[in-house]
Amino acid sequence: MTNPRAQAQETKVALSRRIRDGLKRFFGPWGMFVRGFIKHPVMVGSIVPSSPTLIRHMLRPVDWKNTKLFVEYGPGVGTFCRPVLERMAGDATLIAIDTNEDFIDYLRKDIRDSRFIAVHGSAADVEEIIRAHGFEKADYVLSGLPFSTLPAGVGPAIAAATHRVLRPGGAFLVYQFRARARDFLATHFNRIDNAFEWVNVPPCFLFWGWKD
């Protein structure tokens, strides 16, 4: 005898899969990004991916020649991943961490680069994650996670873990739509450079927290 509840669940899963596949075919990366925003609004900072101008501005201070490990929190559909990979040396590694399994699945299929690792997990566990891939320290960590809307305690935990995982001289690169995000960095980073990027939707604050 067919279980009505199980059948309903199977129908729901199948429908969700068809919607996801349809979005991917019709809208490509942007459709996946919108779907991720709708599914996890507190974990995705904006419904619109970052602009090329913002990406260049954010990555400008990075010393690519001396970068062996670059970590990104909340990569979404890879808006930053591709420019980072273009700039990285051939022996460097990019680890992208996201709690949204749809984004991770998309990135694993879409980015074919041996230097790229997509991990389904929490940014607060960054130390364990990079150790699992043979690293002790990161040179740079990039984040567009919306610190001000994350669940209580998550933002401070991520900032603390990031400071611990960075090598001396490394930096935490943060782009946010609210200036309050600086407060999360100030607890751990003595030197914080900042800027504002107008050419983005919406315009946003940029912070670079440097580890002594």
What feature does the model see in each segment?
Residues G169-Q176:
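Conserved beta-strand signature within the Rossmann-like core of class I S-adenosyl-L-methionine
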Residues V77-G90:
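Conserved SAM-binding loop of SAM-dependent methyltransferases across substrates and taxa
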Residues T93-D98:
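Conserved SAM-binding motif I beta-strand of class I
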Residues P156-P168:
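A short glycine-rich, Lys/Arg-flanked "PGG" loop and its adjoining helix->strand segment in the class I
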Residues F26-G28, M32-K65:
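Class I SAM-dependent methyltransferase Rossmann-like catalytic core
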